[in-house]
Amino acid sequence: MIRGIKPTFLLFALLGSIMLVNLVLPICNLLLHPDWHRWLAAIAQPASLEALKISLLSSCSAVVLMALLGVPLAYVLARANLPFKRFWIALVFLPMVVPDLAGGILLLQTFGPNGIIGQPLDSRNIELTNNLAGIVLAQIFVAAPFVIVSSIAAFSSVDLKLEIAAATLGDSRWHIFRRVSLPLAWPGIAAGLTLAWIRALGEFGSTLIMAYNPHTLPIYMWVKFESDGLAGALPAAFCLVVLATAAVGISMLLSRFTGYADIVTPFGKAAGTGR
């Protein structure tokens, strides 16, 4: 053992434990609270169940659309020799740093009744605000970067020689993508989809502006907090944390069974490497 490493490691462990407590203690305090059975009863109320249904339906719809649209975009950004490539990738990152409420304003300006896209649609009685479509648009805006960025990293980690070998054997670009690139990059893509679903499920700010009604679970939680205080908001918060924890746990289990224990979750190695 190299001299000096142990004290440094202990110092880093101490500093890291402070951060870990800050991250984990609030969640554990919620999950282990003695009133959780009362919160489950509150969640079983019709208004809570409706908000939960809207959240699950919208977040799952958003993830499907992010997979269908975001993964191909990531493949192009990872493999194509595009001009100003760094600029296009930087654009993908922008929604991650734009405040949620500001993102909602931008979406409303674009897709609202007077927006450049919303106005022509509104004249045809197609509305993109205050409905499920508005919720999905808001969720995609804030969560899609997780899918795209993870997928870019996943596709970039696939050995280009494998794609070249498939091309020399006569495979089309579509077959190379479907039979070589996508399977090898899938663990990293799955990590991005998992994070995106959790992010979409908990989205509040942009949804508040784009589609206050129907209430998603985060908005319902805010309404209950405004009317009943902390006690009224805790059941919805408990439900969201349980769903997020379950999603991460399922992702870790799937990674173990598929042989990618270190990469299907957001905690490990680069995509495309097995055990």
Predicted region positions:
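Membrane-water interface segments at the C-terminal ends of transmembrane alpha-helices
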Residues: I2-H37, P46-S156, V180, L184-A200, ...
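The alpha-helix within a helix-turn-helix
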Residues: A166
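Short coil/turn motifs that cap or connect alpha-helices
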Residues: P83, D171-R173
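Glycine/proline-centered hinge or cleavage motifs at structural transition points of membrane proteins
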Residues: L169-G170, P183
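Extracytoplasmic catalytic/substrate-binding loops of multi-pass membrane glycan-assembly enzymes
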Residues: P214-T216
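Helix-turn-helix DNA-binding elements, focusing on the entry/boundary residues of the two helices
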Residues: L162, F204
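Short, Lys/Arg-enriched, Gly/Pro-containing loop segments at transmembrane-helix junctions
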Residues: T258-F267
